Amino acid sequence: CKQAGESCDIFSQNCCVGTCAFICIE
């Protein structure tokens, strides 16, 4: 999964924590 500040997939929500808004937001 992606860390905060990394680019992410808004559809799959592939962040370790928090939410995805083009980048992961803790």
Swiss-Prot record:
Glutamic acid 1-amide, modified sites: E26
Record's keyword terms, sorted: Amidation, Disulfide bond, Ion channel impairing toxin, Knottin, Neurotoxin, Secreted, Toxin, Voltage-gated sodium channel impairing toxin
Primary location group: secreted
Top-level taxon: Eukaryota
An annotated GO cellular component: extracellular region
Listed InterPro entries: Conotoxin_d-typ_CS
PROSITE patterns linked: DELTA_CONOTOXIN
Organ and tissue specificity: Expressed by the venom duct.
Compartment(s) of residence: Secreted
The keyword Disulfide bond is assigned to this record: yes
Single GO MF descriptor: toxin activity
Disulphide connectivity of cysteines: C1-C16, C8-C20, C15-C24
Known role: Delta-conotoxins bind to site 6 of voltage-gated sodium channels (Nav) and inhibit the inactivation process.
Record note on domains: The presence of a 'disulfide through disulfide knot' structurally defines this protein as a knottin.
Similarity comment: family membership: Belongs to the conotoxin O1 superfamily.
Official protein name in the record: Delta-conotoxin Am2766
Source organism phylogeny: Eukaryota, Metazoa, Spiralia, Lophotrochozoa, Mollusca
